[in-house]
From Swiss-Prot:
Principal localisation: cytoplasm
Gene3D superfamilies in alphabetical order: P-loop containing nucleotide triphosphate hydrolases, Probable tRNA modification gtpase trme, domain 1, tRNA modification GTPase MnmE domain 2
Lineage per the UniProt record: Bacteria, Bacillati, Bacillota, Bacilli, Lactobacillales
Organism the protein comes from: Streptococcus pyogenes serotype M28 (strain MGAS6180)
Cofactor binding note: Binds 1 potassium ion per subunit.
Top class in the EC scheme: hydrolase
Domain of life: Bacteria
Positions of (6S)-5-formyl-5,6,7,8-tetrahydrofolate binding: 26, 88, 127, 458
Function, in words: Exhibits a very high intrinsic GTPase hydrolysis rate. Involved in the addition of a carboxymethylaminomethyl (cmnm) group at the wobble position (U34) of certain tRNAs, forming tRNA-cmnm(5)s(2)U34.
The entry's keywords: Cytoplasm, GTP-binding, Hydrolase, Magnesium, Metal-binding, Nucleotide-binding, Potassium, tRNA processing
Keyword match Metal-binding: yes
Name this protein carries in UniProt: tRNA modification GTPase MnmE
GO annotation (BP), single: tRNA methylation
Record-listed E.C. numbers: 3.6.-.-
Length: 458
């Protein structure tokens, strides 16, 4: 984005397109008030107090035609999200009216905002750092209240503060090394000995490794668990999916092979988003369409974080059952013995002891599945600790891992007896990597790519 483009006054519809009670068209930039005033009949928006809502009408300045009756919010820089003048036009919801107002604003001199450009301006103007900007997107995409809690904490600056404090400590250490090298005669500056540098780098490494330990939980809460429901045809997989969803989304019949594809749905299990994948029954078949579904099922099984293997308690184990037991061995697997409301014929002695007996028909023990998921992935601990900072973003996790590797290189060098001044490079690299997380040292291409993932109007 060019410098000129960054200072344009931008506009976009900030509410989802479609019918609704309210639509919002947003403006941000130096000329936001003047452009809004040029299509507004009511109070002079350039003279009203900041953070006020003003009643009036949007008109076409060429024809004088009234477009809509509106409420206009005026917010003056720097006390706005973008730290620029911001105007929000609250219209009646609807595709036609919001689009008409948007086109009027563009004709009056505003530029159509790019995806995420309002948040990008907040970042460029110092209102938020990169982790906080990403948290805005996480709040929008949060599927559960727990995921939203983590995102809100990140928006509040908890991760930024931890990273910035660590970077400052590393910078202090680097400065001390520099002074010792350049001004060895200064007695009032503590000497950065090998032992002291090892102590400091181990402290930094321990802090970052502790943060990495939160990544598994944070990533699950942010992105969800990819969960494959597997089993031979007609054991109750689709019925289980519907039971967990509490609505009929999959085809449920008594005919084997009716689920010919992979069906995906999200469900909230005690704050954990599960991406449920109801797979076609895995069996040998001559039906080409069903064969494709079976292959997709095997792929879903390989990629799943969690496997729910459904067996039929009212029938003896089949070769297909045994094949699935072997295929899913070693994965995070929960074996579900369905149809326990019927006479049981399955050979329990051939199955692992930690299975869960359920009846999808009567809802028996369905709650135990939720408890087992909590046990498998969270060791029965609370999902979100109130004061903890969580890593949940893959970009952050990758950069923290690289920072730890750089610190390990410093410690390896110290163990080999390398001089302190030669280890500055790796310590400086650690400082730079952490800066990429907050955006202090992030390349322009990365920033552009990140904000392009946002929706229009945000």
């Amino acid at each position: 984005m060019s410098i000129t483009k960054e200072f344009d006054t931008i506009t976009a519809i900030s509410t989802p397109l479609g019918e609704g009670a309210i639509g919002i068209v947003r403006l941000s930039g130096t000329d936001a008030l003047a452009i809004a005033q040029s299509v507004f009949k009511g109070k002079n928006l350039e003279q009203v107090a900041s953070h006020t809502i003003n009643y009036g009408h949007i008109i076409d300045p060429k024809t004088g035609t009234i477009i809509d009756e509106v409420m206009v919010s005026v917010m003056l820089a720097p006390k706005t999200f973008t730290r620029e003048n911001v105007v929000e036009i609250n219209t009646h919801g609807g595709i036609a009216v919001t689009n008409e107002i948007l086109q009027l604003l563009i004709r009056q001199g505003a530029r159509m905002a790019e995806p995420g450009e309002f948040t990008k301006r907040a970042f460029l103007n110092g209102r938020v750092d990169l982790t906080q900007a990403e948290a805005v997107m996480d709040i929008i995409r949060a599927k559960t209240d727990k995921a939203m809690t983590i995102a809100v904490k990140q928006l509040d600056g908890s991760l930024s503060q931890l990273i910035n404090d660590t970077r400052q400590e590393i910078l202090n250490t680097l400065a001390q090394v520099e002074v010792n090298i350049d001004y060895p005669e200064y007695d009032d500056v503590e000497e950065m000995t090998t032992a002291l540098l090892r102590e400091k780098t181990q402290e930094f490494q321990s802090l970052l490794e502790n943060l990495l330990r939160t990544a598994k939980r944070g990533k699950i809460l942010r992105e969800g668990l990819s969960t494959a429901i597997i089993g031979r045809p007609n054991v109750g997989k689709s019925s289980l999916l519907n039971n967990l969803l509490r609505e009929d989304k999959a085809i449920v019949t008594d005919i084997a092979g009716t689920t010919r594809d992979v069906i995906e749905e999200y469900v909230n299990i005690k704050g954990v988003p599960l991406k449920l994948v109801d797979t076609a029954g895995i069996r040998e078949t001559d039906d080409l369409v069903e064969q494709i579904g079976v292959e997709r099922s095997k792929k879903a099984l390989q990629e799943a974080d969690l496997v729910l293997l459904v067996l039929n308690a009212s029938e003896k184990l089949t070769d297909q059952d045994r094949a699935l037991l072997n295929l899913s061995q070693g994965s995070n697997r929960i074996i579900l013995l369905n149809k326990t409301d019927l006479e049981q014929k399955i050979e329990l002695e051939q199955l692992p002891a930690d299975l869960i007996s359920i009846s999808v028909l009567t809802n028996q023990n369905i709650n135990l599945i939720e408890d087992r998921i909590n046990q498998l992935f969270f060791d029965n601990a609370g999902l979100v600790e109130q004061d903890a900072t969580y890593l949940s973003n893959a970009r952050h996790i990758s950069l923290i891992e690289k920072a730890v590797q750089s610190l390990e290189a410093v410690n390896d060098g110290l163990a080999l007896g390398m001089p302190v001044d030669l280890l500055q490079v790796d310590l400086t690299r650690t400082w730079e990597i952490l800066g990429e997380i907050t955006g202090d040292a992030a390349p322009d291409e990365l920033i552009t790519q990140l904000f392009s993932q946002f929706c229009l109007g945000k």
